[in-house]
Amino acid sequence: MIVLGLGALASGGGFVAWDRLAIKRLAIVEPGRIVRGAWPGPTALLRLIERDSIRTVVTLTAINLDDPKYVAQERAIRQSDSRWIIIPMRGSTATTDQMAEAADLVADPANQPAFFHCVGGHHRSNLVHAAYLIRHRGYSANGAWDVVSRLPWSRPASDGADRVRIDEFAAQCIPVSFPEDHGHDAKADSLDRAHHDRGDPDPGPVRGGSLGNG
């Protein structure tokens, strides 16, 4: 894990040419607390940080320090009061330890509101989303898979490797809760878990809203 605070960032000028004006695959995991998406351009990231008062940005990928995406995001974070944490997941997957680490980071009230992202906002973000539900909300592997597989960009028929890793994570997982975390209604959480474990119809994910030009 790499933690980058304001003091750790190199000085620099404005943004490099690389930018994306809207965050793809933006979705709310916990209203007011956790949001996920694809790799954001610096303009869209700063809009999200301002709109949602993001305290912590968690990046779920290994990336070279001279990659234009890294350089642009570094400079964006430097302009904010947010903390940036990188968990170097490689390829389109993660180890179960990395899943637990990321889930604990975004679940910690001291880090919230938190935004986590990989590159495409799909496989690694789905794994961390599922890990959070299993480790911190008491979901079964089936229930967590039900949630992430219903996201519009998920492809349940071809995302089998993600499902296997979620099952592995659930088999090894020790549930965790933060003593100061009073943000959930226990009864509502229980009903929500039961709903997904039964495979009941779901109205769909909560969208994060547009952070484009408009």
Pin down the residues of each PLM region.
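Substrate/cofactor-recognition hotspot
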Residues: 121
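Cys-dependent protein tyrosine phosphatase-like superfamily
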Residues: 1-114, 127-214
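Short cysteine clusters
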Residues: 118
